């Protein structure tokens, strides 16, 4: 508290204005969140002048780091020209052309811009139902697709409540009845459900639940692709996180599994708001204007004040242009791999039962009491056990976050999200602070050494 008097004052003001005191659930933090005023590269600074190496990176949107000069210049130049032209513009075409060049499922398809990833997933679900004429949606437990009604039914809820059939309030019964939530990576449950239900689509995070916290693996994706194709079920990859991060073409490029539709966000906008759906022409064609009798009764409408907003398009073009040069991913993946290995070495050296992991090299998770086997969830029993261990991590991870923040490191809960601006010295200092923080937690009895 003594290092953050300015944040304390701002939080007290915020509590009078916002019901939850913050503007995003993930930013809620006890005793208060930190309030930042500027950021550059891998660093950010709070209102009290404290400097942090940042591992939130705009919730994963900033693969190029904060205020990248090329992206910033593009956005500033467009702001001078106008932030909303109320008309079509060339930047939206260039932006879509880059998405097409990068994303395998879009290369012979269409792109449709939205204002957020949540909007993109909503549109993908609607397109799937309209195209197939079927009603049911399969999603996987703990996979996040925005806060919209269809896919929020289980996310961040007590898993025992979900298994007992208790859902978040405010979601209509009809919506709940149209969604089938299955255990992650359980291909047998998928086969059985598709055989017995009116399934329009399957949606998932291809890198795994919650930004890859609970991993998905290539063999499952390959089987899922085969089953959905054989049964005329639309496969949707939610690549809001993995798009342009796992590889230039996202998880679908990395795993070699091409979905029918993909949803995008975060990196797409270069740090500015934006989302998109991309994929098959016959499905996306439902958005088209046609002079066919009765077409207007079948057509999917898509208004949106900030669709392909020029400011986001300018920043997104600049960001994707740098990714297309091919220099971003070798650099960030190499750094992430070394960073993950180093964190695991720390766990081993100071005898703490912990694990660092990640399905993409540039997002690294840490947890206590996890093993590699715990990450291989393929049925409801494995999922329940994984969630039990995750629940046990809540308190020690909160203490770890506080210890790291007080040392000038800002992790995003249990995850470290890297950018190309994280230098070797940033990572080395983070590793040292991680070790010091673990030792502090061990001294205070929050975590303990593993037994021989």
Locate predicted features.
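Conserved N-terminal phosphate-binding loop of PLP-dependent enzymes in the Aspartate aminotransferase
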Residues: 1-452
């Amino acid at each position: 508290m003594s290092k953050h008097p300015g944040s304390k004052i701002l939080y007290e003001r915020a509590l009078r204005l916002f019901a939850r005191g913050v503007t995003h659930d993930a930013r809620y933090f006890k005793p208060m969140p930190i309030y930042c005023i500027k950021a550059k590269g891998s660093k950010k600074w709070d209102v009290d002048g404290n400097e942090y190496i940042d591992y939130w990176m705009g919730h994963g949107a900033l693969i190029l780091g904060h205020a990248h000069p090329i992206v910033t210049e593009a956005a500033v130049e467009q702001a001078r020209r106008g932030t909303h032209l109320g008309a079509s513009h060339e930047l939206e075409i260039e932006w879509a052309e880059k998405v097409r060049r990068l994303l395998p499922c879009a290369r012979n398809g269409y792109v449709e811009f939205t204002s957020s990833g949540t909007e993109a997933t909503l549109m993908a679900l609607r397109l799937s139902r309209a195209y197939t004429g079927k009603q049911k949606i399969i999603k996987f437990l703990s996979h996040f697709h925005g806060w919209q009604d269809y896919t929020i039914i289980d996310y961040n809820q007590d898993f025992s409540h979900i298994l007992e059939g208790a859902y978040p309030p405010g979601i209509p019964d009809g919506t709940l009845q149209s969604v089938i939530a299955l255990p992650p990576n359980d291909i047998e449950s998928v086969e059985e459900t598709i055989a017995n239900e009116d399934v329009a689509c399957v949606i998932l995070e291809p890198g795994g639940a919650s930004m890859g916290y609970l991993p998905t693996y290539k063999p499952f994706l390959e089987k899922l692709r085969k089953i959905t194709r054989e049964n005329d079920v639309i496969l949707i990859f939610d690549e809001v996180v993995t798009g342009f991060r796992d590889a230039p073409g996202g998880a679908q490029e990395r795993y070699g599994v091409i979905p029918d539709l993909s949803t995008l966000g975060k990196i797409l906008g270069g740090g500015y708001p934006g989302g998109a759906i991309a994929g098959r022409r016959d499905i996306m064609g439902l958005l088209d204007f046609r002079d066919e009798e009765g077409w207007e009764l079948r057509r999917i409408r898509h208004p949106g004040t900030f669709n392909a907003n020029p400011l986001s398009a300018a920043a997104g073009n600049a960001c994707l242009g740098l990714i297309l040069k091919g220099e971003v991913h070798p650099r960030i993946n190499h750094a992430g791999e070394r960073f993950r290995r180093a964190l695991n070495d720390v766990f081993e050296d100071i005898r703490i039962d912990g694990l660092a992991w990640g399905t993409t090299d540039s997002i690294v998770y840490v947890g206590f009491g996890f093993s590699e086997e715990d990450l291989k969830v393929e049925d409801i029993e494995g999922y329940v056990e994984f969630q039990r261990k995750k629940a046990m991590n809540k308190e020690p991870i909160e203490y770890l976050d506080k210890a790291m923040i007080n040392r000038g490191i800002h992790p995003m809960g249990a995850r470290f999200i890297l950018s190309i601006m994280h230098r070797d010295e940033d990572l080395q200092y983070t590793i040292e602070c991680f070790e010091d923080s673990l030792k502090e937690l061990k001294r205070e009895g929050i975590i303990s050494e593993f037994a021989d």
